[in-house]
Curated annotation (Swiss-Prot):
InterPro entries the record matches: G_OBG, GTP-bd, GTP-bd_Obg/CgtA, GTP-bd_prot_GTP1/OBG_C_sf, GTP1-OBG_CS, GTP1_OBG_dom, GTP1_OBG_dom_sf, OBG_GTPase
One GO MF term: mRNA binding
Name of the featured protein: GTP-binding protein OBGC, chloroplastic
Keyword Isomerase in annotation: no
Keywords tagged on the record: Chloroplast, GTP-binding, Magnesium, Membrane, Metal-binding, Nucleotide-binding, Plastid, Plastid inner membrane, Ribosome biogenesis, Transit peptide
Region of interest (Disordered), ranges: 25-72, 657-681
GO cellular component, one term: chloroplast stroma
Biased composition (Basic and acidic residues): 43-55
Transmembrane stretches, start-end: none
Cofactor(s) it depends on: Mg(2+)
Matching CDD domains: Obg
């Protein structure tokens, strides 16, 4: 098959839209003594496509007029060569002999076409690099390179092949792979890659997570900026300032939602930001308040402030983080972060001495923090025990809960809650916790993730598997894990329920188990949760313990009333810190440098709210530094000409004037060349 080689030079414009080159193919008159058919059959095109792609044809029997065809495709040569297969394998493969010679003739015809194609490729002009061309673009040969079969009648078909740049890594890999000898198999081992990357530590699968811990980011809204405006009205020549104040930023609230039983919503929603207050306007119009944001949590959520990255307390395992809020009952609502105050407009700065103030404040930035949320289920009774002891079955019998029940350990992966009703006004919430193993207090198994849920339970039910080899040891192991995790949990009242009495093994071991526990002063109960036998006695006994516990510990209600009164104590504390007096500050010097730091919550807030676009703001700032005693403290500590004074986010340069007065000036300000104001450095 003939082709035309075209040499072309690429320019940047040509690369953007290369010209299309038509290829002209010469039609051979005869191939192997036969006239070529006007159109190729589908079989011919597929075989020709395979031959052009570089794949070897499958072996054909040498017998004249007969071809060997497999009922299934032979193995790919990318993995191993067919020639390596033994003759026994070929005999086992099912074969079909074709008496007609059509297939053999097609194969013969294709071999002839391949020979002609190889001869034509040898005559083609190879591409070469032309280093003398500006732009260092490559001189290329456009030649036949299509792997698609071409019909005679397909005259409008065009093929274009372009190369640009050096050979890619993928092409190099392909060329290296093509140099393998016949019969060679290239194997890749994942051990080297595993050694380089290392074994990553996997966490608990998503299906096994309770989502009782979460870390979220909350930020109150910033206050709106004040505006500098003046009254412009007909027949009012001196209207005076009319700039309004900015609106207050939105608050961040935490509210208990009774419909939630986990912290799953915080898996994807992590950031909670309140709206910013609107800026002030003319005509004494104040900006609107920003939108509040409400973070809804499940009952029993404990809110702690997360440790900041790089803090000194980070990494200390023994120290508990401070508890900000403990929300137990649905409907509780606490103000966590108050919004920033809006900046004042120029109307707020007018006075008898300054009737035309050209000054306004920025809005106060809203506070922000990272919070650690921990959920402790609020349940009256907790069901504990070893895996596959029948805890979920007991919960499904005594309540309307439908936990997953199966005859294998760790069927329960998440805590389940159920409500048990005795009378119209007598109910109790029962929690089914996953099974505990030896070492659960150290994090072994699933127990460490859920043991803390028992801290809020008033009573416990120990379910013992009667079919276990030694039920007494199983009971003692669970008790030991509870004591090691928290001695307070071990001191809570509990009831022992000996389960699976419907099994012969459990029935035989019951007398010995009962005698062992009675010797320790414990009266156990026997039951069969599957048969619903003995469960009423167990729950009735637990309910009696619960009533006694509530009567003896009547202070939780008082604590609840006190908590309702102090739910906003976090916001009050933050607001008090932000309202610190401006004269409360500390000055210290960096060792080895000429930098002085003035640290104070009031001063930092003042610097942040100062709008430095107005010259009156600079004058006011210098006056505040003199009034609160910053300049005096710096001179007493030995500040010198040219030293850097850092107040909040501002860096100033200290200068001593000729008349003996000293003051820091802003190092970031440009020169104003004003007669009234000194030149800013």
């Amino acid at each position: 098959m003939a082709s035309i080689s075209i040499n072309c030079f690429f320019t940047p414009q040509a690369l953007a839209r290369p010209s299309r080159t038509r290829k002209i193919f010469a039609k051979p008159d005869k191939v192997s003594g036969r006239t070529r058919s006007p159109r190729k059959t589908k079989l011919q095109r597929e075989v020709e496509l395979k031959s052009r792609g570089g794949d070897k044809l499958q072996p054909v029997s040498d017998a004249g007029g007969e071809a060997t065809t497999y009922t299934r495709l032979p193995p790919r040569e990318d993995y191993y060569d067919v020639s390596l297969l033994s003759s026994s394998y070929l005999k086992v493969s099912e074969e079909v002999k074709l008496s007609e010679s059509n297939v053999a003739r097609v194969e013969e015809k294709i071999e002839t076409l391949r020979e002609i194609e190889e001869e034509e490729k040898e005559k083609e002009v190879k591409s070469y690099d032309d280093d003398d061309i500006w732009g260092n673009y490559r001189r290329l040969d456009v030649f036949e390179g299509s792997s698609r079969s071409i019909d005679e009648d397909d005259e409008d078909w065009e093929d274009e092949v372009f190369e640009y740049g050096d050979e890619t890594d993928a092409e190099k890999d392909d060329s290296e792979g093509s140099e393998l000898k016949d019969g060679e198999v290239l194997c890749f081992s994942g051990e080297e890659e595993e050694d380089e990357i290392g074994v990553k530590e996997k966490g608990v699968p998503a299906v096994m997570r309770c989502f009782d811990r979460a870390k979220i980011y909350v930020r109150a809204g910033d206050g709106g900026n004040g505006v500098v405006a003046f009254r412009r009205e007909k027949f009012v020549p001196f209207g005076g300032p009319s700039g309004g104040d900015g609106g207050r930023g939105g608050n961040v609230y935490v509210e208990v939602d009774g419909s939630m039983n986990s912290l799953l919503p915080f898996r994807k929603s992590v950031h909670f930001r309140a709206g910013r207050g609107e800026h002030g306007r003319g005509k004494m119009q104040s900006g609107a308040k920003g939108d509040n944001v409400v973070v809804k949590v499940a009952p029993g959520t404990v809110v702690r402030q997360a440790r900041e990255v790089g803090s000194e307390v980070e990494g200390e395992e023994g120290e508990e983080k401070e508890v900000l809020l403990e929300l137990l009952h649905p409907g509780q609502r606490a103000l966590l972060l108050p919004g920033g105050r809006g900046g004042r407009g120029n109307a707020s700065f007018k006075s008898g001495m300054n009737k035309v103030p050209r000054i306004a404040e920025n809005g106060e930035e809203g506070p922000e923090m990272w919070l650690d949320l921990e959920l402790k289920l609020v349940a009256d009774v907790g069901i504990v025990g070893a895996p596959n002891a029948g805890k979920s079955t007991l919960l499904s019998v005594i309540s309307a809960a439908q936990p997953t029940i199966a005859n294998y350990p760790f069927t329960t992966l998440l805590p389940n809650l159920g409500v048990v009703s005795f009378d119209y006004d007598s109910t109790m919430v029962v929690a089914d916790l996953p099974g505990l193993l030896e070492g659960a207090h150290r994090g072994f198994g699933l127990g460490h993730e859920f043991l803390r849920h028992t801290e809020r339970c008033s009573a416990l039910v120990h379910v013992v598997d009667g079919s276990a080899p030694q039920p007494e040891l199983e009971f003692e192991a669970v008790r030991l894990e509870l004591e090691l995790f928290s001695p307070e949990i071990a001191e809570k009242p509990y009831v022992v329920a000996y389960n699976k009495m419907d099994l012969p093994d459990a029935y035989e071991k019951w007398p010995m188990f009962q005698e062992t526990l009675r010797a320790r002063g414990i009266e156990p109960f026997c039951m069969s949760a599957v048969q619903r036998e003995g469960t009423h006695e167990v729950i009735s006994s637990v309910y009696e313990l619960l009533k006694k516990y509530r009567a003896a510990n009547a202070e939780p209600k008082a604590l609840f009333d006190q908590a309702n009164e102090n739910l906003d104590h976090v916001a009050k504390k933050i607001d008090k810190e932000r309202r610190a007096a401006i004269n409360e500050f500390e000055v210290f010097r960096d060792s080895g440098t000429r930098a002085w730091h003035v640290v104070g919550a009031g001063l930092q807030r003042f610097v942040q709210m100062t709008n430095w676009r107005y010259m009156d703001s600079d004058k006011r700032f210098q006056h505040v530094l003199d009034a609160c005693g910053v300049n005096k403290s710096l001179k007493n500590m030995g500040v010198k000409e040219g030293d850097t004074v850092i107040v909040g986010e501002m860096e100033l340069i200290w200068h001593d004037s000729a008349n003996g007065s000293s003051r820091p000036t802003d190092s970031n300000k440009t020169s104003t060349d004003s007669v009234r104001w000194p030149q800013w450095k």
